[in-house]
Amino acid sequence: MMSMNSKQAFSMHPILHEPKYPHLHTSSEAIRRACLPAPQIQGNIFAGFDETLLRGAEALAAVDIVSQKTHPFKPDATYHTMSSVSCTPTSSSVHLHHPSVLTTHHPHHHHHQPAQGLEGELLDHLNSALPLGGVPGPDVGSTPSHPHSHMSAINHMAHHSQPMNMSHPHGLASHAVISGPETETDPRELESFAERFKQRRIKLGVTQADVGSALANLKIPGVGCLSQSTICRFESLTLSHNNMVALKPILEAWLEEAERAQREKMTKPEIYTGGDKKRKRTSIAAPEKRSLEAYFAVQPRPSSEKIAAIAEKLDLKKNVVRVWFCNQRQKQKRMKFSATY
């Protein structure tokens, strides 16, 4: 009899004894109660035995929940929160986030009414666990039994990260405005200025090399001498757009200074060249050249008074007009000679 009683005591009563770690026992039993479907309980052959066990577990879980209210940051409470979220599809974390999370759960998951007693506590812990912006933490819904809900939570975090990054669009716009150029110059305006600059430079009798070397005398910060090829490429519009935009105000400043010096009849060699006494080749712009050709067709040998009138009308020097007529007559003679022989 003693051996039978000892066997009965060994087989019937060890589960009802006080466990060694009551908090871990109550936590595991509460999770088992929340995740265990009702059909499994009814179909169990030890239904009566399990009901007695579950009643005791519910009583211990109720005592544990009361203790959680006094200690909200207890490790067991955090364990309840993180675990019951992954097991219960009707938990509060589903209602706090995007509706697409609802569609990612498996259809065989059922709604369990016994877990509703824990949802009041879950709301408090989830609200305190959520970071700023409503994005769930990395531990929420990350159990391997729900891969679809885990992926939907990751997608939801990526979906909400864009508004957080763009929370200050006006700040980004202000940086974009500062980094870009202050004023955008129209290419047609650059082309018009390049043609106008070339004509006015020719009227002043200044070569492209003289313009490049005279820019250093303007004392513009960051601007030194430029090569003749740079001025030539500017006039022919073969520089890049950014270089054209940067060079335009510099050449405008030089042109204004040179024309002011000519109007005042002041000799400022530093604007042109630094003491070069060599006679320079005179260039005539296309409009003036067409006018001279028209005068030459009417009168190849104009008088001195006529040459002076033409020079004044075209804003050219009298000697330049006289030399052009002389050169044009020599050119006509060469053309007639080559046609004869």
Swiss-Prot record:
Every POU-specific domain range: 182-259
Intrachain disulfide bonds: none
CDD domains listed in its UniProt record: homeodomain
GO annotation, biological process: regulation of transcription by RNA polymerase II
Signal peptide: none
Span(s) of short sequence motif POU-IV box: 55-65
A molecular-function term among this protein's GO annotations: RNA polymerase II cis-regulatory region sequence-specific DNA binding
This protein's UniProt keywords: DNA-binding, Homeobox, Nucleus, Transcription, Transcription regulation
Cross-referenced Pfam families: Homeodomain, Pou
Role of this protein: May play a role in specifying terminally differentiated neuronal phenotypes.
Similarity field: Belongs to the POU transcription factor family. Class-4 subfamily.
Name of this chain's protein: Brain-specific homeobox/POU domain protein 3
